[in-house]
Amino acid sequence: MVLSVKQTLSPKIGLFRRNPSSSLGRSPVSLSFPSTELPKRTVLAVSKPLHLSSSLRAKSPVVRCEAYEADRSEPHPIGDDAAAAETKSEAAKKLKIGIYFATWWALNVVFNIYNKKVLNAYPYPWLTSTLSLAAGSLMMLISWAVGIVETPKTDFDFWKTLFPVAVAHTIGHVAATVSMSKVAVSFTHIIKSGEPAFSVLVSRFILGETFPTSVYLSLIPIIGGCALSALTELNFNMIGFMGAMISNLAFVFRNIFSKKGMKGKSVSGMNYYACLSMLSLLILTPFAIAVEGPQMWVDGWQTALATVGPQFVWWVVAQSVFYHLYNQVSYMSLDQISPLTFSVGNTMKRISVIVSSIIIFRTPVQPVNALGAAIAILGTFLYSQAKL
């Protein structure tokens, strides 16, 4: 684009020095002057291709300068046009992020509702977790096959680096599902809001990282709020509580492995999560068979169909599909926004899940329990602010 346009006493343009009287014969390929004489005292310094045109009006020649991007055929906006274009671009970006967030929250709420319905009728969290990963893997394989999504270019090193991430993701996913099979959805998410505390502790004592005092102070309301909610939970279950805690720890390691191993990898957020789901599915399937087994699944399936009816099949399909979709959108959102904005969005997502699950499942909540949840979520928000 144009770097400078200024007036001097020398009739030269860019690197071309010309005599006005001899300029009528021919012109450089990149310049066009319809008028009979090039206006004097003009210097243009450029770093990209220019198109210049001169037109004579009533008394004096007017030089019109348009800058073109090298790979575009339209003039690059200048001045007020550039400001208007930038404002329009910012508005479009904010709208796109808003749509991402709204979709992310909505999909997550729907998943948690159907997931809890399935687990209430069919208490086999290992199979439920496996079906969630299988549905997402199948959806992405079809998307790659028909060309809806570009197939990622991966190699052995990519999958080797992804393996520890997939192990941590598998453990976190199964542990969270086990937790939801034993306790209320709201309680699981209240405990999972304590994930930042695990992140700081692991980073401090295992990785040797240090944090500002404000980060450590933000852990006080997180830990205190989670503890208050756990102590006042009406339907407390130790397996459910420990499942949520293990999920927190596993997802912390997943994030650490992902940050360390995936630097410089040119894979989009959507494809990255697809590869993660496929590898996690391969890891989880043999363990699910060993822990629960086909015989238990068949017996439980028949019981669920007899109790709930044919709509139970829809519940299973919905929870599996929506699990992949909400995670996929979250990874796509992370491609577009800063980690701070993502953390705030994740906090708001957890609030929407807790509130909606309490309303839909009519979960009894004591005032002290609600206070603990609010304190824990506030601490999570303060942590996201202090961390960055």
From Swiss-Prot:
Every EamA domain range: 112-229
Membrane topology per record: Multi-pass membrane protein
UniProt keyword Membrane present: yes
Tissues/organs with expression: Expressed in seeds, flowers, rosette leaves, and roots, with highest levels found in stamens. Found in the root cap, in guard cells and in mesophyll cells.
GO cellular component terms listed in the entry, alphabetical order: chloroplast; chloroplast membrane; endoplasmic reticulum membrane; peroxisomal membrane; peroxisome; plastid
Deletion consequences: Gametophytic lethal phenotype in homozygous plants.
First and last residue of the signal peptide: none
Compartment(s): Plastid, Chloroplast membrane; Endoplasmic reticulum membrane; Peroxisome membrane
Pfam families: TPT
GO terms classed as biological process: embryo development ending in seed dormancy; embryo sac development; glucose-6-phosphate transport; lipid droplet organization; phosphoenolpyruvate transport; phosphoglycerate transmembrane transport; pollen maturation; response to nematode
Name the UniProt record assigns to this protein: Glucose-6-phosphate/phosphate translocator 1, chloroplastic
Superkingdom per UniProt: Eukaryota
Transmembrane segments: 95-115, 129-149, 158-178, 211-231, 233-253, 273-293, 305-325, 363-383
Transit peptide: 1-65
Family: Belongs to the TPT transporter family. GPT (TC 2.A.7.9) subfamily.
GO molecular function: glucose-6-phosphate transmembrane transporter activity; phosphate transmembrane transporter activity; phosphoglycerate transmembrane transporter activity; protein domain specific binding; triose-phosphate transmembrane transporter activity
InterPro entries according to UniProt: Sugar_P_trans_dom, Tpt_PEP_transl, TPT_transporter
Keyword field: Chloroplast, Endoplasmic reticulum, Membrane, Peroxisome, Plastid, Sugar transport, Transit peptide, Transmembrane, Transmembrane helix, Transport
Its job: Glucose 6-phosphate (Glc6P) transporter. Also transports inorganic phosphate, 3-phosphoglycerate, triose phosphates and, to a leser extent, phosphoenolpyruvate. Responsible for the transport of Glc6P into plastids of heterotrophic tissues where it can be used as a carbon source for starch biosynthesis, as substrate for fatty acid biosynthesis or as substrate for NADPH generation via the oxidative pentose phosphate pathway (OPPP). Required for pollen maturation and embryo sac development. Preferentially exchanges Glc6P for ribulose-5-phosphate (Ru5P) in reconstituted yeast proteoliposomes.
